Design a protein with these regions (language model features):
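Catalytic loop of short-chain dehydrogenase/reductase
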Residues: 13-20, 93-127, 135-176, 188-191, ...
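A glycine/serine/threonine-rich, flexible loop-to-helix segment
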Residues: 47, 176, 188-212, 222, ...
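Aromatic pocket-lining residues of Rossmann-like dinucleotide-binding sites
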Residues: 28, 174, 230
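Canonical Rossmann dinucleotide-binding motif of NAD(H)/NADP(H)-dependent dehydrogenases/reductases
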Residues: 2-37
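Conserved mid-core segment of classical short-chain dehydrogenase/reductases
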Residues: 54, 60-71, 75-79, 86-112, ...
Length: 254
């Protein structure tokens, strides 16, 4: 028996098979869960990637900035399962002008995009899934340490700080419904999304040196396993928490 036996999990944010969300979906299936994926934009690509999972799951289109997509999500998911026990938020995006050392000159429209897609979408996704979570469950989001100002991360760092605050407020308001809300702050992993961040090479060099446990930037397993653990029943009284799966780098000075 796996720790997710019988659970139904919605996983967002799969872009390629290097995505942390992909490995969350794979591990969730291996631990007994039924999985539904969402994709944005190039849906056929996500469908091809989904076929690499142990059991190819259904893939639904979801643009978290589209009220129509959000409003119909529960109905579309219910075509495949009558409930959700867990939701994984693996969605983040910032325009290039909001990254790479341009912090002081970034225009509000680009800041707003980063915050809406990377932070507000946690609340939007939670509310969209809520009709299928009458029995309680777990919402887990993927995070990156927002306690300091990282080189080149700029407005994405601000958005991640917003994500962390959003998770705490959701934990407060969804707790009475039996829904736990937690984040996993991953160390840098060489994904397609990460490669688009200017200065990511600096993280690749810095992190293994800082992390007391070491850090492999090619291995998405540590954060994926943390997500699966939080989706399980093994943390029944944990909510509003940020679990760092980063080799311990967050705990030590530079």
């Amino acid at each position: 028996m796996g720790i997710l036996d019988g659970k139904r999990i919605l996983v967002t944010g799969v872009l390629t098979d290097s995505s942390i969300a992909f490995h969350v979906a794979r591990l969730a299936q291996q631990e007994g869960a039924d999985v539904v994926l969402t994709g944005f934009g190039r849906l056929s690509l996500v469908e091809r990637i989904a076929r690499r999972l142990p059991g190819p799951p259904p893939v639904l289109e979801l643009d978290v900035t589209d009220e129509g997509h959000l409003g119909s999500l529960a109905e579309r998911v219910s075509a495949h399962t009558d409930r959700l026990d867990g939701v994984v938020h693996g969605i983040a995006f910032a325009p290039q002008s909001a990254l790479g050392g341009n912090f002081l000159n970034t225009q509000w429209a680009d800041v707003a995009t980063a915050v809406q897609v990377s932070a507000y979408s946690l609340k939007a996704l939670a509310m969209a899934a809520l009709p299928l979570m009458d029995g309680g469950g777990a919402i887990v989001g993927l995070d990156f340490d927002a306690s300091v100002a990282w080189p080149a991360y700029d407005w994405m760092g601000v958005a991640k700080a917003g994500l962390e605050s959003c998770a705490r407020y959701l934990a407060r308001d969804l707790g009475p419904r039996g829904i736990r809300v937690n984040l996993v702050a991953a160390g840098p992993v060489r994904t397609m999304a990460a490669k688009s961040i200017p200065g990511f090479a600096d993280f690749e060099e810095l992190w293994p040196k800082r992390a007391p446990l070491g850090w492999d930037i090619t291995d998405p397993q540590p954060p994926a396993r943390a997500c699966v653990a939080l989706l399980s029943d093994w943390f029944p009284a944990t909510t509003g928490e940020i679990v760092h799966a980063d080799g311990g780098a967050h705990a030590v000075g530079g």
